Curated annotation (Swiss-Prot):
Found in a nuclear export complex with RanGTP, exportin and pre-miRNA. GTP binds at residues 15-22, 65, 119-122, 147-149. GO terms for biological process: protein import into nucleus; ribosomal subunit export from nucleus. Residues 65-81 are annotated as: Switch-II. This is GTP-binding nuclear protein GSP1/Ran. GO terms for molecular function: GTP binding; GTPase activity. One of its GO terms (cellular component) is cytoplasm. Residues 34-42 are annotated as: Switch-I. It comes from Neurospora crassa (strain ATCC 24698 / 74-OR23-1A / CBS 708.71 / DSM 1257 / FGSC 987). PROSITE patterns: RAN.
Length: 215
């Protein structure tokens, strides 16, 4: 009998319109096999990845847009084993709201591994710059620039979470999942520039708690 695939509940949160559903729908198998939970108004996408230690699966809980009507019910967070908080790099308010999502997530799930993702880096008019993205450093989260529409860095958050959950930094993804074709293109030179800016920002002291733009 085949061993059961290790499966983890991943809670995906962030303001409405930041691209959470677009992101999770990129994984075609997960999109095909998703299940709708009417009681919570949630779509659960089973996202499978092949690793050098065998298969691993994230059951990604997506709110299906109900976050637009206020906070999410605790049932959404309960038994969450890892999380992704998403904001839109073209919208400052979505980044300003990240601490609220983090507070809700950790209030129920406590000390779980969390990745902060800045989506839509394919859009040239970036508003949330590297030097202002400091929240992850204060709370010991991982951060990635992503572009859901172009599949840029799609696997990075899942790989980081998988390593944390399995407790092994030698874990690697050995086969790419089937992803939807890109509907946007990222400028690779610009992505390199963003990466360099994030590396540089990581060396800077954190702003004081009193600062208005302290996030």
């Amino acid at each position: 009998m085949a061993a059961a695939t290790p499966t983890f509940k991943l809670v995906l949160v962030g303001d409405g319109g930041t691209g959470k559903t677009t992101f999770v729908k990129r994984h075609l198998t997960g999109e095909f096999e998703k299940k709708y939970m009417a009681t919570l108004g949630v779509e659960v996408h089973p996202l499978g990845f092949s690793t050098n230690f065998g298969q691993i699966q994230f059951d990604v809980w997506d709110t299906a847009g109900q976050e637009k009507f206020g906070g999410l019910r605790d049932g959404y967070y309960i038994n969450g084993q890892c999380g992704i908080i998403m904001f839109d790099v073209t919208s400052r308010i979505t980044y300003k709201n990240v601490p609220n999502w983090h507070r809700d997530l950790t209030r129920v799930c406590e000390n779980i591994p969390i990745v902060l993702c800045g989506n839509k880096v394919d859009v040239k008019e970036r508003k949330v710059k590297a030097k202002t993205i400091t929240f992850h450093r204060k709370k010991n989260l991982q951060y990635y620039d992503i572009s859901a529409k172009s599949n840029y860095n799609f696997e990075k958050p899942f790989l980081w979470l998988a390593r944390k959950l399995v407790g092994n930094n030698a874990l690697e993804f050995v086969a790419a999942p089937a992803l939807a074709p890109p509907t946007a293109v990222v400028d690779q030179e610009l992505m390199e520039k963003y990466r360099a800016e994030m590396d540089e920002a990581a060396q800077m002291p954190l702003p004081n708690e009193e600062d208005d733009d302290d996030l």
